[in-house]
């Protein structure tokens, strides 16, 4: 329960929910959603009948549920909107990325991908002007040694000269810049192997999984796992000449090549711009187990999963679309971020096809925060389906339907959307349940770590 006092309306609603005769069932529904902040409400029914005899095998209706509704998880990936669903999304992303690094027989990804050349690369945005930072040595250019959580970190040293328009236009075109980078990367690999671009697919494929991250200054950069496979994907071995060193060298060359650029035409008072990656490029080999010099599979997967649930909120912007600039006042948006949002508003009529104002809450970025090439790994959809199939199998076993042939059972259903979210009192109770679930997860993780440590000592 929260430490602060509840207002009378919330307290009264909380007591109403907690004292209801069907509270236990309501709590069970909330736990099944992961105690999400914004559950989806459905009304309706489902009916299982024997096709031959017409016998009713099972009948379910939401009429018997609390409030006459069934509550489901909202599925929002953003931690700022629904920590519970974001936790599930992060877990799926972790398994997706790690399967592409270590293999997963359940997903038809062989463990031999561990022997393929793999690197973890970070491509950053160029500079749009000096900002307050915290260098490893010395002080910021403003003369201050900023604290790690200083609010001014990432803000422009001189807002009058900072290129806010360039920053949001870069974010807006970052997806295209990534596409050109991957195209150039294949050409660089082919050149180092003495092959033409058309000959390369007969010998090798480039696979990747990536995630976008906003720096405090509001500029986007990409973290990517890049892997070299044989011509048929992860099931085939890449040629002997395809090494980690060759891949790393090709990445650096592709990022720096003039082809890897995106041009934006001039419009009214805005000059023509050509965007390229920043000079801070990091390429690190990925190893199965760490020896202190390379990044490990688990570390990479955890890092990517962490940022898959975030957007631009770490800059202080909103986590939803902005209707009017006045909304920024109500949410105490920092000045630097506000100027980036205002730049989106100002540039929108100059570049209408880029829909900058519609994506102002993302500081201009309009792509997917996490994405992958087709053959890198499994898909998020496949992971969700596996979870749904598991739950369906549990239900069938509980209802004694698993002994019947699927084609002998007729399933009828009718579902209607009935709203979303919690009442004030439900929100407080759900938040308490969510904290308990999170504590249980943390306790379980600590227990697993202790067990692994003990097994390591015993070995």
UniProtKB/Swiss-Prot annotation:
InterPro entries tied to this protein: RepSA (IPR046828), RepSA_streptomyces (IPR048241)
Keywords associated with the record: DNA replication, Plasmid
BP terms from Gene Ontology: DNA replication
Chain's role: Essential for pSAM2 replication.
Stated name of the protein: Replication initiator protein
Organism field: Streptomyces ambofaciens
Gene: repSA
């Amino acid at each position: 329960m929260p430490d602060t006092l509840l207002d009378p309306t919330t307290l009264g609603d909380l007591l109403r929910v907690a004292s209801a005769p069907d509270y236990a069932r309501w709590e069970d529904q909330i736990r099944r959603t992961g105690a999400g902040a914004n559950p989806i409400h459905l009304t309706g029914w489902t009916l299982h009948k024997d096709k031959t005899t017409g016998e009713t095998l099972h009948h379910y209706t939401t009429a018997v549920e609390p409030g006459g509704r069934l509550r489901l998880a909202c599925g929002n990936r953003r931690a700022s909107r629904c920590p519970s669903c974001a936790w599930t999304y992060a877990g799926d992303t972790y398994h997706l990325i790690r399967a592409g690094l270590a293999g997963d027989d359940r997903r038809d990804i062989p463990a031999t991908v561990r022997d393929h050349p793999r690197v973890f690369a970070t491509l950053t945005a160029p500079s749009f002007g000096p900002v307050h930072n915290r260098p490893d040595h010395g002080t910021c250019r403003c003369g201050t040694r900023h604290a790690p959580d200083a609010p001014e970190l990432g803000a422009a040293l001189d807002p009058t000269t900072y290129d806010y328009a360039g920053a949001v236009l870069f974010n807006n075109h970052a997806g295209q810049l990534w596409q050109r980078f991957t195209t150039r990367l294949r050409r660089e690999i082919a050149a180092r192997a003495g092959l033409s671009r058309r000959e390369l697919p007969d010998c090798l494929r480039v696979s990747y999984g990536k995630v976008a991250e906003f720096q405090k200054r509001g500029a986007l950069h990409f973290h990517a796992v890049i892997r070299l496979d044989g011509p048929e994907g992860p099931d085939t071995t890449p040629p002997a000449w395809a090494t980690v060193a060759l891949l790393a060298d090709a990445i650096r060359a592709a990022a720096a090549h003039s082809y890897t650029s995106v041009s934006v035409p001039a419009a009214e008072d805005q000059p023509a711009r050509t965007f390229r990656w920043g000079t801070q490029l990091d390429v690190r080999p990925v190893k199965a187990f760490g020896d202190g010099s390379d990044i490990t599979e688990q570390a990479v997967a955890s890092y990517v999963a962490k940022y898959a649930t975030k957007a631009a909120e770490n800059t202080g912007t909103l986590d939803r679309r902005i209707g009017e600039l006045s909304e920024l006042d109500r949410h105490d948006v920092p000045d630097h971020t506000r100027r980036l949002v205002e730049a989106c508003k100002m540039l929108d009529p100059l570049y209408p096809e880029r829909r900058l104002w519609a994506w102002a809450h993302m500081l201009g970025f309009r792509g997917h925060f996490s994405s992958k090439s087709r053959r890198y790994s499994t898909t998020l959809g496949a992971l969700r389906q596996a979870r749904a199939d598991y739950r369906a199998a549990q239900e069938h076993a509980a209802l004694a339907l698993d002994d019947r042939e699927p084609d002998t059972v007729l399933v009828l259903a009718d579902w209607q959307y009935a709203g979303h979210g919690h009442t004030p009192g439900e929100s407080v109770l759900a938040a308490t349940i969510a904290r308990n679930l999170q504590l249980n997860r943390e306790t379980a993780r600590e227990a697993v770590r202790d067990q692994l440590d003990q097994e390591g000592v015993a070995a």
